[in-house]
């Protein structure tokens, strides 16, 4: 390094000083970028699948609540029976489809049966199980109520029919036409056939949901299978172990106005 005219050494320029202390980082290899990108993309897909499953279970929960409200309305004189049964059929069909989709999505994101389980997945399993149990219970209630209404409509005589057809015709002849509001025998027979069809369809859907509930219990991860009913509410971080009990706020079947 040359000396300055006054005897002092020249200081290195600013660019030279910065280059001296510059730390060079080795560039990432192509494989590192791919691994980092694939890991982030996989985590994003998993979270998106979890969110979709959570939304689907919540929608099924709401559908079960709506069906329950319809079941409670069976026998209400202010509700038209044909329109009520049609609405129940639509709601029940939509709920069964949601239940099947929720089970498929939940089974896809749960991972290995003996592996660690995320608390949110555990919660979704419990919510779906509770909703299915309530759903089948409400279907059984609707079958009992529809059958009871059908029985009372036919009459309470031991023979199953209230009055003979001749008696009905005589009563209709004695009553003025403008005041005759009683249904005809043909209407009664058609109504009875429709109610019987609704009962059969409800029984079919109830059996399907019971089978789905059995599949759900079979495909549950081992940490959930090994827990009893009281400890299922202790959704602790994975791996799932028994800790002190805490309250479970995942309520089922609430309809917000």
UniProtKB/Swiss-Prot annotation:
**Predominant location:** nucleus
Q: Which GO terms describe its cellular component?
A: cytoplasm; glutamatergic synapse; neuron projection; nucleus; postsynapse; postsynaptic density membrane; presynaptic membrane
Modification after translation? Palmitoylated. Undergoes rapid palmitoylation turnover. De novo and turnover palmitoylation are both mediated by ZDHHC2. Palmitoylation regulates the cell membrane and nuclear shuttling and the regulation of GPCR signaling. Upon depalmitoylation, it is targeted from the plasma membrane into the nucleus. GPCR signaling inhibits depalmitoylation and promotes localization to the plasma membrane.
What topology does it adopt in the membrane? Lipid-anchor
Name the residue ranges with Basic and acidic residues bias: 32-45
- Where, subcellularly, is it found? Nucleus; Cytoplasm; Cell membrane
Instruction: List keywords of the entry alphabetically.
Output: Cell membrane, Cytoplasm, Lipoprotein, Membrane, Nucleus, Palmitate, Signal transduction inhibitor
Any one GO BP annotation for this protein: G protein-coupled receptor signaling pathway
Annotated region (Disordered), positions in chain: 1-45
Where is the motif Nuclear localization signal annotated in this sequence? 242-247
Lipid addition sites, S-palmitoyl cysteine: 252-253
Task: Tell me the superkingdom of the source.
Answer: Eukaryota
Q: Which InterPro entries match?
A: RGS7BP/RGS9BP
What does the entry's free-text domain comment contain?
A: The nuclear localization signal is both required for nuclear localization and palmitoylation.
Give the family from UniProt.
Belongs to the RGS7BP/RGS9BP family.
User: Could you tell me what this protein does?
Assistant: Regulator of G protein-coupled receptor (GPCR) signaling. Regulatory subunit of the R7-Gbeta5 complexes that acts by controlling the subcellular location of the R7-Gbeta5 complexes. When palmitoylated, it targets the R7-Gbeta5 complexes to the plasma membrane, leading to inhibit G protein alpha subunits. When it is unpalmitoylated, the R7-Gbeta5 complexes undergo a nuclear/cytoplasmic shuttling. May also act by controlling the proteolytic stability of R7 proteins, probably by protecting them from degradation.
* Complex formation: Interacts with 'R7' family proteins RGS6, RGS7, RGS9 and RGS11. Component of some R7-Gbeta5 complex composed of some R7 protein (RGS6, RGS7, RGS9 or RGS11), Gbeta5 (GNB5) and RGS7BP.
What this protein is called in its record is Regulator of G-protein signaling 7-binding protein
Q: Which organism does this sequence originate in? A: Bos taurus
């Amino acid at each position: 390094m040359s000396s300055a005219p006054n005897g002092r050494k020249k200081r290195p320029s600013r660019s030279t000083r910065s280059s001296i202390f510059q730390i060079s980082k080795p560039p990432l290899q192509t494989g590192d970028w791919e691994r980092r990108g694939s890991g982030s993309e996989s985590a994003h897909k998993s979270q998106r699948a979890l969110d979709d499953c959570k939304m689907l279970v919540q929608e099924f929960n709401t559908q079960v609540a709506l069906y329950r409200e319809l079941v409670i309305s069976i026998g209400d004189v202010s509700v038209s029976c044909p329109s009520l049964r049609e609405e129940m059929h639509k709601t029940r069909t939509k709920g069964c489809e949601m239940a099947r989709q929720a089970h498929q999505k939940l089974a896809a994101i749960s991972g290995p049966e003996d592996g660690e389980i995320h608390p949110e997945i555990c919660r979704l399993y419990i919510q779906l199980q509770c909703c299915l149990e309530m759903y089948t219970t409400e279907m059984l209630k609707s079958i009992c109520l529809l059958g009871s209404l059908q029985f009372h409509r036919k009459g309470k005589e031991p023979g199953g029919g209230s009055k003979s057809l001749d008696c009905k015709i005589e009563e209709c002849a004695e009553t003025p036409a403008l005041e005759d509001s009683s249904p005809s025998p043909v209407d009664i027979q058609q109504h009875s056939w429709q109610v019987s069809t609704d009962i059969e369809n409800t029984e079919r859907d109830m059996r399907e949901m019971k089978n789905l509930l059995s599949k759900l219990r079979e495909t549950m991860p081992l940490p959930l299978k090994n827990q009893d009913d009281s400890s299922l509410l202790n959704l602790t971080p994975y791996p799932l172990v028994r800790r002190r009990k805490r309250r479970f706020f995942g309520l089922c079947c609430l309809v917000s106005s």
